[in-house]
Amino acid sequence: MLARVGAMTTAVLGSAVFWAQQKNTEPVQANLNLTNTPSTDQSSSEYELKLVQVLFRHGARTPLKSIPDVLEAHWVPDLLEVPDYTKIDYVVTDLQGGPRPPSPVEDSYRVRTLAGGTYPGQLTTLGMKQLYDLGLRLRRRYIQDMAFLSPYFNNKEVYIRSTNIVRTIESAKCLVAGLFQQQQADTVPILTEEAEKEILYPNYHGCRLLKLLSGSRWAESSTLPDIASDLQSIQSVLGVRPHQHLDFILIRDDMVARQTHRLPCPAALDSWRAKVEQRAVDMIWHIYEPSNRENLQLCVGPVLHTLLTNMETKVQGNTSDSDRKLFLYSVHDTTLMPCLMALGVFDMRWPPYAADITLELYQHRHNRQHYVKISYIGQDQKIPGCSDVYCPLTEFQQALSMYALPEESYHTLCNRRADIPTH
């Protein structure tokens, strides 16, 4: 049984199929009705940019599983062609620079093929372009407008880590191609971790307590009165037989993948799209239970701690790592959502393909204090507990202290009460 990456399924306590069904789908467009101010250049004379960290979701992909009992879309190999403009010289390694670890998640996708001949969960040509375009957006800001990064890839400036899944690795590659326009002084290393130790998504295989706590909440999520009623209705509308497993996350995964790639969708879904989006998010909200501090700690505590540690290293400036200017993390929707919940800015919308959370660390030119600015899909966010969009680092650290967790504490917590029976 493996860690979940994306759309969590009822097989939360299952086996390799559990991996394959895990990842959730993606809204076609960001469509954020935010009240936050758009991300603009720093009140530039006052703040000097010191560090950028970007958590980004992979691009558009094939679905993880098709809705049962409905006409399947044909996911043909032509949809996965690699554009020349995304090609770079890169290598995938473990965190120490050794061989890439095995990927049980990817292996689970390749035990079956979708109609049309491709595997589930594969980055498509459209997804590659989406990440290339995100790289272009970062290039405009950090190379052209702010002259913060070198115009070519430099391993001393840029650190790249991805979950050990082909679509996230390829997404990282495409972003780097857009960011540096295929100009590189070094081979681009993309670092990965073995599945059991992965912290870049809620790891239900590596953290027994998380699996225990989430298992019952996953089962509950489809039985909540409003969700259960709507699920019964849509199952009837689609003509899905009662014995087939179906939930709104699975429906959304297939629906949005088809919609994004302009492939035929069951006509019966047309009037249900908004409801499917809403109920899928309702399920995730229930499963992650953001009001439960411990649950978010187990989901993304080590990720948040890593982001804070990178900032502290930059502030201290006394190690070779302090030369880094950009950290890139290629992750999943199920990484971004609990991070947004912990930050207090989740807008109850599913993160679209190529969505990003960007953390910028600044130093004020006059008082020499450090500040953090967060944006989500290019929109500045005022974090609860912060006095301004430019949040004093001490305030930001305090705001995340409830959820950030060093890996040692994380492992201790994961192994605590792991033998408590589910309820």
Regions found by a protein language model. Name each.
Residues 2-423:
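Signature for phosphate-centric chemistry
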